[in-house]
Amino acid sequence: MVEGARIDQAHHENWAQRALNETVHLNQAVERAIAMVNLSETLIIVTADHSHNMVFSGYATRGSNPTGI
């Protein structure tokens, strides 16, 4: 089992870059799991118990890095 709880923790703290990084890490873990099993004999399920939205407010200029806030 792989859990991505740090994605949720980052969203609670409004840490956009950390939430994105943790999502990438979860994706990499799922890719590794897929590589380790026989997919004709194994079911891999990725799910969530809730979600968060990510809002970038303010008056950023074009080309600004939203994760550098």
Go through each PLM region and give its residues.
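A post-motif C-terminal structural segment
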Residues: 1-69
